[in-house]
């Protein structure tokens, strides 16, 4: 049985656009890239270089944000587990009101 080859493409996540600093950095970067393209002797090469560098930057940013989100979820899960254990160890209905 032949296995189909699967191509995985990275898609730009719109989550970083929720941060004003990121949007302003993108705007400044685009303006600089536009200026460089206008002055370049070989705009196609400059464009592909800028595109690959920008893609790498966005991939790294996306990876960092996902890592931070996973860390927050892990801490919240641990906190919830501790609260759940304390709830089960408490005796009586009056003690359960605290939780």
Curated annotation (Swiss-Prot):
This is Secreted RxLR effector protein 94. It comes from Plasmopara viticola. It is found in: Secreted; Host nucleus; Host cytoplasm. A motif (RxLR-dEER) lies at residues 35-55. One of its GO terms (cellular component) is host cell nucleus. It comes from the Eukaryota. The lineage of its organism: Eukaryota, Sar, Stramenopiles, Oomycota, Peronosporales. Its main location: secreted. The RxLR-dEER motif acts to carry the protein into the host cell cytoplasm through binding to cell surface phosphatidylinositol-3-phosphate. Secreted effector that completely suppresses the host cell death induced by cell death-inducing proteins. The keyword Signal applies. Keywords: Host cytoplasm, Host nucleus, Secreted, Signal, Virulence. Coiled coil: none annotated. Belongs to the RxLR effector family.
């Amino acid at each position: 049985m032949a296995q189909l080859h699967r191509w995985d493409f990275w898609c730009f996540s719109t989550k970083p656009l929720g941060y004003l600093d990121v949007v302003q950095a993108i705007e400044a970067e685009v303006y600089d890239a536009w200026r460089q393209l206008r002055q370049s002797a070989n705009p196609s090469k400059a464009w592909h270089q800028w595109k690959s560098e920008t893609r790498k930057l966005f991939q790294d940013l996306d990876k960092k944000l996902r890592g931070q989100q996973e860390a927050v979820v892990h801490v919240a899960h641990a906190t919830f587990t501790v609260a759940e254990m304390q709830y089960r160890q408490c005796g009586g209905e009056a003690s359960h009101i605290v939780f």
